[in-house]
From Swiss-Prot:
Known partners and oligomeric status: Homodimer.
Family: Belongs to the succinylarginine dihydrolase family.
Major enzyme class: hydrolase
Species whose genome carries this gene: Burkholderia multivorans (strain ATCC 17616 / 249)
Cross-referenced PANTHER family: N-SUCCINYLARGININE DIHYDROLASE
Name listed for the protein in its UniProt record: N-succinylarginine dihydrolase
Pathway involvement of the protein, from the record: Amino-acid degradation; L-arginine degradation via AST pathway; L-glutamate and succinate from L-arginine: step 2/5
Keywords: Arginine metabolism, Hydrolase
Function in brief: Catalyzes the hydrolysis of N(2)-succinylarginine into N(2)-succinylornithine, ammonia and CO(2).
Amino acid sequence: MNAQEANFDGLVGPTHNYAGLSFGNVASLNNEKSVANPKAAAKQGLRKMKQLADLGFAQGVLPPQERPSLRLLRELGFSGKDADVIAKAAKQAPELLAAASSASAMWTANAATVSPSADTADGRVHFTPANLCSKLHRAIEHEATRRTLSTLFADRARFAVHDALTGTPALGDEGAANHTRFCAEYGKPGVEFFVYGRSEYRRGPEPKRYPARQTFEASRAVAQRHGLAEEATVYAQQDPDVIDAGVFHNDVISVGNRDTLFTHERAFVNKQAIYDTLTAALDARGARLNVIEVPDAAVSVNDAVTSYLFNSQLLSRADGSQVLVVPQECRENANVAAYLDHLAAGNGPIRDVLVFDLRESMKNGGGPACLRLRVVLTDAERAAVTSNVWIDDTLFTVLDAWIEKHYRDRLAPDDLADPALLVESRTALDELTQILRVGSLYDFQR
């Protein structure tokens, strides 16, 4: 059956800021309390969407979540009118106001794990929103994520949108940032690859400096609820040493697409066994695994973390060749730039490298891959997505003007205490729901 991989990028929200909330994310910590530019952040992401759509790739957009989250602040004991809640939180616990104001839902690679209909037992596309329970500012996202996905993918005969797994450390789930899929063609049955950092109940190596956010138990639960074939599901442990070096999700150290795995040589525990298992599973699905392993001598783990070489999008063109979408930081790192030149000049599947300015997102630890959720859809499934979320000339122009109208070009940590920011954000989001035709998506609209 004919199918295409669509990328749904998160639109950066009006409260984009640098609060340093993500322990284990080096960029986030290094840029704590810097002044952010929400308008630039949103436009940088939108330009990437538009350019990829212009190149013929299926490109959708997911709306921001409502921030600041008054629901969280009230749950934490702050009371009164909305402005009073914000003022009390700013005075008594500014760190909680920062968590409630985070625009981290922009990184939709963490929104959910997605399995296409070709892989699932019931022939539907399955979505499991990630519980993101390792961080407060992200643990509040999954309910709104489920609501958004249920709105966009509303046809229950074609789509199954699950609740997130129970938010406990044993089931820590970070979504598609630790998942990829290999296949001969998008519409044919493939092999789903789940990467975890630790196991709650099995003994094994664990990082010592930074937390492992994804558990084996969570990955297995997602695979089981999606109805994946056991012989076409592969689990791998990320090397704990690279987690301690700042690789907080697997998409910071490897990326896969179709029959290609682009990875650092230090990405996995027992890597050869993983390659062999993937090769055998994919062989049974009519494809041969192509591993492009970047040696540590050419690009160190530190180079990978600072440049986000592997937090790239690996996209297939109609002719079968692949293009690597990287942030401009890759061109600013001499080792990474040299490797990319070598890669593009070779005879491998990756023939082209596209470079994007995503500086505002990158300063918070989010590159091209963080900003997108991959959803493989058949023609009929794509037609069932009736909201106005597919990027084209018209939608790009409307969204660009919407950002220009509603977003600030400067947001410092102290600005989160401004009650006008809540009003501005709600006004913007209310208008956005009309643009995207998604109905009353937000709590304040209900």
